[in-house]
Structures are given as structure tokens and as C-alpha cells.
Amino acid sequence: MEKKYLKKINTAGLSIGLIVVTATLFSSCKKTAQPTDPQLSNAAKSNVHTENTVAPGNADAAFSGYNSAFLVNSGGTAYYKQSISSSTADGTWVASLDILAAEDDYERTGDPATKTLINNLLTTWLQNTPPPWTWDGWNDDIGWFSLALIRGYQMTGNNNFLTEAEYGFNMAFSRGWDTQYNGGGIWEQQPNMTPAGQAINKAALSNNSLGKVACLLYQSTLNTTYLNDATQIYNWIWAHLYNSSTGLVYADIDENNNVDMGSAVYNQGSFIDYANYLYEITGNVNYYNDAKRSIDYVKNNMTTNGIISNDASYLNTWGDEFARGLGHFVRDNRMWSTYYSWMMQNANSIWANRRTDYNITWNGWNEPTPSDNTLATSKFASAVAWLQFTPGAQPDNIAGEHVIVSAQNGIAVDNGSSTTNGNGVIQWGENGGLSQKWIFTQNEDSSWNIISEDSWLALDVPDGNAANGTQLDQWTPTRATNQRWWVDLQSDGTYKIWNQATSGCLDNSSNSTNGYKLIEWGWNGGANQRWELQ
């Protein structure tokens, strides 16, 4: 099996040729270290909220072009072709990379049509690649399979995707985690399935991809076994494949503890995303520091004149995982002022070098995309991903992690430390706990999703009930209108937070009792309806 995506290169040499807009083994011990009229139509609301909108830039055109060039979608069957000139569906791990780009678009937009597309893409993929997957000895393949599926579950709610993502992770982790060599780690390719003469090692690709899957499985199930697995894998990577001084993620380590210190942008990106997930799940700032250090390594060492680019013919994707890792880190931690200009520099180079007939750009972001209809579909996924995470204008500070505090009494919105669907949302004295941390992400219509970092459930109006006094609850994220919120800056610097479906505002009933219910109520402009985002 030829693994072009996984071909190992010494990027001490490659980095010299990188162009366009990112050893020592360590101890196994982890370091410590204006009010608006609630009767406005949805269209009018969209116009009111433009100051908070994450502008799409060229993201819509890029995804539309990607689909025009490669997507086959008919009668519920959907797949990406191997190339423009091909009629054959992309398969296995490469198809997973294609689908991840579509999931990036849905993450940005919340578009119901893209949600349906993702459901059809993954359903078709499972029909073409049914489990069991024990025939595939490459554990990172299973990582990409499972990553596309678990993201798809979080977006569509299709339980079959969760079932198969769990199967994929558990199968690869149970067979791949080995303590005989290197004190742990997941084999890149199972030794007993590796042809004679091929390398046997434990790679960043297999460990980062499966570690990310474990994080998303934990978010989806709250099964602490997955969090323990994610932490175990991460600690091993940190000790064996991560340079904590520079932020470089090494390629792999073999049975004799020989480390391939070659670098790849996708390895950096997977690690960054992984670290950021663990930071959000645990609150441990060391994960944040690791992620930022690895972003800065790419920015300072793996670009030419600021641009990330690689036109190597053997590659499938190059910058897609970095786009996700950087995009999530910057959005969730409100780091736009630090990285936005660099993100836009790359976005502009991507767009300037696109094929204008399809609006698609290959991995070489600093040079014109060839008009070659035989180039693999996955070569164009990284540009699509980057544009989904780079808004057309620098966002304000609403997006990201916040504690939501009442301007009236200083008490915080709290999920009651509950992981149960339908549990009522309450107020509690600010304490810095995960039950009081909420991630704000935006939809294309400029509304906001508000997700608990404790339960990974969404702030929700039960059944879209518009009655004044209805207690708000938490529910599995669906991005339905009863989970979409307008977040409007007021003249005093506070925010009005009101529901798209009901127009009811987040309200504390002018009560300062710990544990008291938070409700919705029609806007009256009182201090009980004004909130600070910390």
C-alpha cells in the first residue's frame, strides 16, 4: 500500500523549499507547570448583527468550487471523486480527508444543506468502506476514518457515526498501543502487518489523530475512559515526539528509540488541535502553552515570507490539520489580534493562486495552481479548510471561551455541574470552574451557539417555548433555532443575549441566590438582562 500522505521526509531540507502564507527525548513525566426590536424578521436581524458577524471572506466560494470540481451528489449518494477527470469515488483514508473539508464548512456556517451533505457523504463512505477495518494495518488510517465520523456525529446526530467512530478508535488503540518499546505509543503500521523492509515506528500521525478522536469521543459521550486514553496518548507524545523548547513535533520514533526529527505542517496542526481540545476539556494551561508554542514554530520556521506551501507531488493534504488547529485555537482563545493578519496573508495567497475556473487551490499556496485535471482531490482540501477558519474581517471578542456574568449581581451562568440533557441552567457565584465556562461559536446568519465546556451541551430554550419565565436548559448541540442566540453589544458595554426562536432574553429574575434558575423574558433593558462576557 503506497502511503503518499505518510511519506517521511527530512524537512531540514524541505523547509528550505517551503513557500507561501507556519533531538532530544524528554522524561516521561508530563510538565506541571444596541438593544434591537425582538419582533424583527430573521432577515432584518441578520442586518442588525453585522458588527458581530464572522465574515465569510472567500470561504463560501472556495467550498462551492471544491464541490463543483469534485462532488458527486445524487439521490442520497454522495462522494468526492478522485480528481476532476475521474469518475471514481475517493476511498478509505483519502476520502476521509476530503470529507473533513466539508465538515469544516459546516462548522463555520451551520448550513442545514451542508449538514445533509455530510450525513450523505459519511453514509456513502460507510457503505463503500464497511467495518470491520482490521484489514488496514495503518493505525493513522483508522484515525482519519474515525475523526471524520466523530465530527460527523457531532454535526448530524447520526448515532451510527458515533458507533463506528468508537469502534475505530477502540480497535486501533487496543491493537496499536504498545509498551514493549518506547514506553508506550501507538504503532503507525502494525508490526505484524508491515511488509519486510518497511519502517516500523510510532508516528505523530497515528498518535495525534487517534488522540484527537479520543477527545471528541469524550465530548460526545462523557465517558471518562476516552479522556484517560487521550491524556495517556498525549503524555507519551509530549515525552517522545515533542520538543517542549521549540514546539516542533517530530515525525516518529522506532523500536530502538531513534527519532525522525522531520517536520510536517499537518503533524504540527494535529498536535495543536489535540492540545487545544485537552485544554478546553481540563482547563490545564500547559496544553494551551504547548499548542501556542507549536503554532509559533510553524509561523517562524515553516513558511517562506509568511506563507505555508508545499507543492510536492507525493502529498495529499498539507495544511488542512494546521488550519483546524490554528483556527480552533485562535477562535476559542480569542487570539485574533495575534494571528489574524498572518491567517489573512495566507488566505490572500490561496485566493490569488487559485484556478479561477473552479476557485480551487492546491497545496502550493505561493504559486499558481496548475490546470491539471488529474491532480488528486485531497490536494485541494487544505485551501478549503484554511479559508473556513479565516474570516474576511477580523472578528470582535465575542467568539471563544467566556464566563457569562450578570451585570446586576456579578453571578455567573452555570450548568450546575450536570452532564444531563434537559438539566436546567442556573446562576452561581463566579468560581472559575468548567461549569461556568462557555464557548461561543457563530453561524453564518450571525447568531451564536453557546456550548458548556463542562457538559459539551448547548444553551437551549426547551422545545422553543416562548413563554416568559421558561427556565433555560442544556441539550445536545443541534444548531436549531432554539439553540441560536443573538449577542448584542449595548451602549454600556454589556451584552443582551436573546434567543433566535423565541426572542426571549437571558434573564436572572433580579435574584442573587446561588442555584436560582435562569430564564428567558422579553427584553426590558433592565440590569437583570445585561451580561458581561469575561
Regions found by a protein language model. Name each.
Residues 269-282, 290-301:
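Oxyanion-binding "anion nests"
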Residues 2-16:
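Bacterial N-terminal signal peptides that target proteins for export
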Residues 48-101, 105-140, 202, 263, ...:
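CBM-like carbohydrate-recognition segments
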Residues 214, 218, 226-275:
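Active-site cradle of extracellular carbohydrate-active enzymes
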Residues 396-534:
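Lectin-like carbohydrate-binding module/patch detector with strong preference for beta-trefoil
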